[in-house]
Design a protein with these regions (language model features):
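Extreme N-terminal starter segment of soluble prokaryotic enzymes
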Residues: 3-9
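Short amphipathic alpha-helix
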Residues: 21-29
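Short beta-strand segments
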Residues: 39-42, 181-182, 216-221
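A short beta-strand-loop structural module common to alpha/beta enzyme folds
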Residues: 33-47
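Secretory-pathway luminal glycosyltransferase catalytic domains
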Residues: 53-212
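A short, Lys/Arg-enriched amphipathic alpha-helix followed by its capping loop at the start of a domain
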Residues: 28-35, 211
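A short, glycine/small-residue-rich beta-strand->loop->alpha-helix junction that serves as a flexible
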Residues: 11-21
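Donor-binding and catalytic core of enzymes assembling or modifying cell-surface/extracellular glycoconjugates
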Residues: 16, 207-228
Length: 228
């Protein structure tokens, strides 16, 4: 039996920045492979904070996406996910399928390797149009410049409903606002923490001061008391 239309499933995971890149990848894939139906697998968001932030932050009426069902994910990967995957028989089945596909080299799951940065995964350019695919990665490095107008039309923030945020938005739009994000939290003391041994923020702000008249800095952080 053959399904009516081949499907490409893009995994949604991580915070809003990651989810934006994954959404952009899904739109790029839909443009490149119009014969496929591209869907988003948001099941990761059901069990991890902060959830499916993409639809919380942006206007749902502008976003263009279809959610993948468990059946879609099974089609694309050939293995069980979610609650079913925790059952003993499903674990055995999944292990056998993964092992067989690794041995034969015919996996339809593309896993972006991120150990050393975010390298381009060339296989993305040459997907077999007769197969279903599961795309798992972050895709920060992807060149989306050719489709920026499309993304800008779709990724439109939901209007503020609280008066204080609406007032702040009006204030920012009326000046040379510069947003500075200082990530602390899980980054503090880790290999990703650039604050102790770097002038990254100082140098960046100096460039802003040199090039922009009367900038207003809006600083945000997951630990604002430390960021200041």
């Amino acid at each position: 039996m053959r399904w009516a239309k081949t499907v490409i499933v893009v995994k949604i995971q991580g915070g809003l920045g990651n989810q934006i890149s994954q959404y952009a990848m899904s739109r790029w894939l839909q443009n490149k492979y119009p014969e496929h139906q591209v869907k988003l697998d948001a099941s990761w968001c059901d069990i991890h904070a902060p959830g499916f932030e993409l639809v919380q932050a942006f206007d749902k009426n502008r976003l263009q996406y279809l959610l993948a069902t468990p059946k879609d994910v099974f089609r694309a990967t050939g293995i069980f996910h979610g609650d079913t995957a925790n059952q003993v028989w499903a674990k055995v089945y999944n292990k056998l399928v993964r092992g067989g596909r690794k041995l034969l080299g015919n996996s339809t799951e593309i896993q972006q390797q991120v150990a050393s940065g975010y390298p381009v995964t060339q296989q993305i350019y040459h997907l077999d149009k007769e197969h279903d695919w599961y795309i798992n990665g972050f895709w920060h490095n992807w060149d989306y410049t050719s489709m920026l107008p499309q993304l800008q039309n779709e990724l439109v923030y939901t209007p503020w409903t609280e008066k204080k945020f609406a007032a702040l938005q009006s204030e920012i739009c009326g000046c040379n606002g510069v947003a500075v994000h200082i990530r602390l939290g899980d980054y503090s003391g880790s290999e990703h923490d650039i604050l102790p041994a770097s002038n990254y923020y100082k140098d960046a702000l100096q460039q802003v001061l040199d090039k922009l008249p009367k900038p207003v800095i809006y600083l945000f952080s997951d630990e604002p008391e430390k960021a200041f």
